[in-house]
Structures are given as C-alpha cells and as structure tokens.
Amino acid sequence: MPKGDGKLIAQNKKARHDYSIIDTMEAGMVLQGTEIKSIRNSRINLKDGFVRIRNGEAFLHNVHISPYEQGNIFNHDPLRTRKLLLHKKQISRLETETKNTGVTIVPLKVYIRDGYAKVLIGLAKGKKSYDKREDLKRKDVDRQIDRTLKNFSR
C-alpha cells in the first residue's frame, strides 16, 4: 500500500500472475452507502475488474461488491460501473499509456485509509504463458534456496 497505513480489504492476486505491473497509483472510489458497508465487511471481488477511461474520467468495471445483508430495496447493483477519483494529469497519463502501448489498467488492492475506500490500480502488460511458467519456476527455486539456508543455519 502506498504511504500511510490502511486496512487491507481485498487483493487481486490473479493480476500479478496474469500481468506484469509497470506502475501503480492510488484512486478514490465513488460509492453508495450500502457499497461501503459491504466493503467494510470484505465483501468485494476484484478478480475480473479493469479500468476504462471515458470522456476524461476513469471508471472501474466488473468489480463485484456483494449486496449489503441488512440493506433493503435501496441496495446497490453488485456489478455496477464505479467512477474513480483521480487528478486530471493522472487520467491523461493513463489514457496515453493505454492508447499507445498494449497495456491495460487493473485494480490490485482495495483498502480503507482515513475512513475512505481506496483502490490501488496498476498499469499492466499481459504476460505470455511461458512467462508465467518462468515466474513459477523462479519462485519455486527461491523457496528451495530459502528452505535449504534455513535448514543449514540450524
């Protein structure tokens, strides 16, 4: 999480597996009352989420926030599109990055900082299947090295 301490609510582990993250930035979310209550209960899924920029504004798509259990007829739509709060310079930079190169914007983490729900978004480039296999092999080798060093030091 960037600067400051916040309570981590959800993490998109699949994003780091499917994409190589180039850059990250923090954005606020425009939410309804029942949505923030569900987020505080960790009822959010970032797995298929992505960010699209339209008319100079950033929107979060395909992020599932479960309906609030104590909500009534005013409960929210779980998959609705949510606006992200970013500075104009940040939005224009994201827009140029996504138009020129083959990168996309994915949500990485959702956390609450100072009472506000924040999302950490990342500029991501898709990995090929051989890159994914290579990363898994590298992690496995690192784990084995750590294990042998731990046993050797005893």
Swiss-Prot record:
<comment type="function">
    <text>Required for rescue of stalled ribosomes mediated by trans-translation. Binds to transfer-messenger RNA (tmRNA), required for stable association of tmRNA with ribosomes. tmRNA and SmpB together mimic tRNA shape, replacing the anticodon stem-loop with SmpB. tmRNA is encoded by the ssrA gene; the 2 termini fold to resemble tRNA(Ala) and it encodes a 'tag peptide', a short internal open reading frame. During trans-translation Ala-aminoacylated tmRNA acts like a tRNA, entering the A-site of stalled ribosomes, displacing the stalled mRNA.</text>
</comment>
<dbReference type="Pfam" id="PF01668">
    <property type="entry name" value="SmpB"/>
</dbReference>
<dbReference type="GO" id="GO:0005829">
    <property type="term" value="C:cytosol"/>
</dbReference>
<keyword id="KW-0694">RNA-binding</keyword>
<protein>
    <recommendedName>
        <fullName>SsrA-binding protein</fullName>
    </recommendedName>
</protein>
<keyword id="KW-0963">Cytoplasm</keyword>
<comment type="similarity">
    <text>Belongs to the SmpB family.</text>
</comment>
<dbReference type="GO" id="GO:0070929">
    <property type="term" value="P:trans-translation"/>
</dbReference>
<dbReference type="InterPro" id="IPR000037">
    <property type="entry name" value="SsrA-bd_prot"/>
</dbReference>
<dbReference type="GO" id="GO:0003723">
    <property type="term" value="F:RNA binding"/>
</dbReference>
<dbReference type="InterPro" id="IPR020081">
    <property type="entry name" value="SsrA-bd_prot_CS"/>
</dbReference>
<dbReference type="InterPro" id="IPR023620">
    <property type="entry name" value="SmpB"/>
</dbReference>
